[in-house]
Design a protein with these regions (language model features):
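A structural signal for small-residue-enriched, beta-sheet-centric alpha/beta enzyme cores
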Residues: 6-223
Length: 223
């Protein structure tokens, strides 16, 4: 598999794909980190049947608890186990980094995030209220020994064991530059992809699965 900023993927030149996603220009790296202050970190566990990890997204380099950022959430999959969404929906703010991991490691990662916030904010639950940790998840049991609970509090890449459309899934990112009322803005996105079947792989109306059928056999989707 080869990728060079989208020029070549699975041995297919970008011109063969026959599509372009959107019309807006992207940022310098075409990643969410093009948004000023936003950073992303990964810790990958890759050892035999252990194929998992944790990804952390920090909205800015300062104290997120005291310098909260505006936030919103929208749930389209009633099977998710993300923590912290109720308060985001109620207050419209984010006060911790956002962490991503596998489904059965949400509790461990949430505890690690709480400890991280308490260490940096001794006023939490003393002179202020509690903290709202946000941990997102996907089921990586198709490629990972998820029952082994291998993620510990010391592990701070969630996408290692994910599959998407029967292919290798995981963490992906992009950015777009927009002009609004004479001002320039950078919009970033980070996804943890783990869904769908090979035959459903259609991008911008182009049946990508047909281009790949001769190269990669489809796999059963475990959800």
């Amino acid at each position: 598999m080869e990728s060079n900023n989208g020029e070549v993927f699975m041995g297919i030149d970008k011109n063969e794909w026959g599509f372009r996603v959107g019309h807006l220009p992207h940022g310098e790296r075409n990643k969410i980190s093009d948004v000023p202050g936003v950073t992303v970190g990964h810790c990958t566990l890759a050892d035999g049947d252990i194929q998992t990890g944790v990804t952390a997204l920090l909205p800015h380099p300062g104290d997120v608890f005291h310098d909260k950022v505006l936030a919103a959430c929208h749930v389209i999959n009633g099977f998710g186990k993300t923590t912290g969404l109720v308060q985001i929906d109620e207050l419209g703010t984010l006060e911790t980094p956002i962490l991503f991991t596998n489904t059965l490691s949400v509790g461990t990662v949430e505890t690690a995030l709480v400890k991280y916030m308490l260490e940096r904010n001794p006023d939490i639950c003393e002179t202020t209220g509690s903290v709202n940790p946000v941990v997102c998840e996907c089921n990586d049991s198709g490629l990972n020994d998820i029952r082994g609970l291998h993620v510990t509090e010391a592990h701070v890449a969630a996408g290692r064991g994910m599959r998407c459309h029967g292919l290798k899934g995981g963490i992906g990112s992009a950015s777009r530059l927009v002009e609004l009322d004479g001002k320039s803005y950078t919009i970033g996105a980070l996804v943890l992809s783990n869904h769908a079947t090979f035959d459903d792989l259609i991008v911008a109306g182009t049946p990508i699965h047909e281009l790949l059928e001769a190269r990669i056999p489809p796999h059963e989707d475990k959800g």
